[in-house]
């Protein structure tokens, strides 16, 4: 089987946008690279991050390696290594992209074979 793609709709819990953006602002290039490598090692890749405003919402497109289920991805994105960064600041609604409707063409080049 092939990897799966998810669109994630992130929206902030009350009063959490400021603290979340504060943590994001502290992440330098080295920290971001380390985080991306950690995600790859556990089978996830963030293809794009699309915030609409500082108060949200935000959208992302993620890829999950074959073997990681939809439930696994929800646990990851809600957990300390996911978008919440350990703060429980976001509600994360995941939507699996139906690649059967695209003729099997993924929205991005696959990172996982």
Tell where the protein language model's regions lie, with residue ranges.
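A common structural junction motif
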Residues: 78-89
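Short S/T/G/P-rich N-terminal loop/turn motif that feeds into the first structured element of a domain
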Residues: 1-57, 63-75, 94-113
